[in-house]
């Protein structure tokens, strides 16, 4: 068992996938698996995944018929070996090397089942903070339209499975 399974749903992402995976490879936390779910891509995403798998033994690739990112994420949760899971879409990236380590430290320190961090939206060189994480306590995001930003969260895998999330 590893600490974190990073689940990457992949669909026709040959142009962005290498950058996304590189941002996972550079993480300071190395006790991770990178679980890529190829969701029926028709481009060269499979070639990028094969290359990544050869380059880094933490990469594990699964292939399925196209069923959508949600189904790919759920398959990733079911197949994951990590105590925690994180999601990273194939067109997103972790902005620095300490993202997973910081989230894991916060989750273990607090005992939280779900732990989140900051979000920045970038378009070219234009970067805007959308949510800034502080350590002052729990921030309720229920009233904010942030539900699509899976990459900012770390989830206790057992919590997701037990609650069928």
What are these regions (language model features)?
Residues 1-165:
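Nucleotide-sugar donor-binding/catalytic module of glycosyltransferases
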């Amino acid at each position: 068992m590893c600490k974190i399974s990073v689940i990457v749903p992949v669909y026709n992402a040959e142009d962005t996938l290498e950058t996304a995976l590189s941002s996972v490879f550079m993480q300071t936390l190395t006790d991770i698996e990178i679980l890529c779910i190829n969701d029926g891509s028709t481009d060269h995403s499979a070639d990028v995944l094969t290359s990544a798998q050869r380059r880094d033994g933490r990469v594990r690739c699964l292939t399925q018929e196209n069923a959508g990112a949600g189904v790919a994420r759920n398959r990733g949760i079911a197949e994951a070996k990590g105590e925690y899971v994180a999601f990273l879409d194939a067109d997103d990236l972790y902005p620095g090397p300490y993202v997973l380590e910081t989230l894991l430290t916060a989750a273990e320190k607090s005992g939280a089942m779900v732990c989140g961090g900051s979000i920045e939206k970038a378009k070219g060189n234009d970067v805007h903070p959308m949510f800034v994480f502080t350590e002052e306590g729990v921030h309720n995001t229920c009233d904010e339209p942030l539900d699509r930003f899976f990459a900012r969260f770390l989830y206790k895998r057992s919590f997701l499975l037990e609650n069928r999330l």
